[in-house]
């Protein structure tokens, strides 16, 4: 059953990186277990706007995997109705809170890239803060708001930035921080 679950989760991942004019984007995920709560996804809204999601449902195994699939379906259903990222964050949270088990939550970065204006808009729901990297420094952005699903009436603050020519925007999940090799 876990192998079947892994195959379903793999099928839900994007087959390729998004092709956004003027941008170079690399999405990567490698689950630590057969199935789990990691979500990496994107959806093209129109010729200029693409949304990216990086999320991590708390826990491991089948429960986390099922709630991750539910979260992905919710995001995809609501993404085309964007008025503001704050609003979509509130809607995603309300649905996840309503439909999940008590004390189950997810961290999430929901990012909208506008290739026409060069803007990155995002909300951070309890996820690791994104980084801006250039040849001189690494800058950690805001830690964000409460994780998805903890309370039904959460608020999410939309942040906007425009990258300079030499800057890189990095969004990551716990696998980067918790990864260990034979040297620790």
Short names for language-model regions:
Residues 174:
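Conserved catalytic-loop aspartate of Hanks-type protein kinases
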């Amino acid at each position: 059953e876990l192998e079947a679950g892994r195959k379903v989760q793999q099928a839900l991942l994007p087959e390729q990186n998004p092709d956004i004019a003027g941008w170079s984007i690399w999405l990567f995920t490698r689950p630590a277990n057969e199935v789990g709560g990691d979500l990496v996804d994107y959806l093209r809204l129109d010729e200029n706007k693409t949304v990216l999601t990086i999320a991590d449902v708390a826990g491991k195994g089948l429960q986390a995997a099922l709630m991750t699939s539910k979260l992905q379906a919710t995001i995809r259903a609501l993404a085309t109705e964007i008025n503001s990222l704050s609003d979509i964050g509130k809607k995603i949270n309300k649905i996840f809170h309503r439909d999940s088990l008590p004390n189950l939550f997810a961290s999430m970065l929901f990012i909208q890239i506008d290739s026409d204006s060069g803007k990155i808009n995002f909300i951070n729901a309890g996820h690791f803060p994104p980084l801006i990297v250039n040849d001189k420094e690494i800058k950690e952005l805001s830690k964000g708001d409460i994780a998805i699903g903890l309370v039904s009436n959460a608020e999410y603050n939309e942040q906007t930035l425009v990258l300079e020519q030499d800057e890189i925007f990095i969004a990551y999940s716990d696998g980067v921080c918790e990864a260990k090799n034979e040297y620790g």
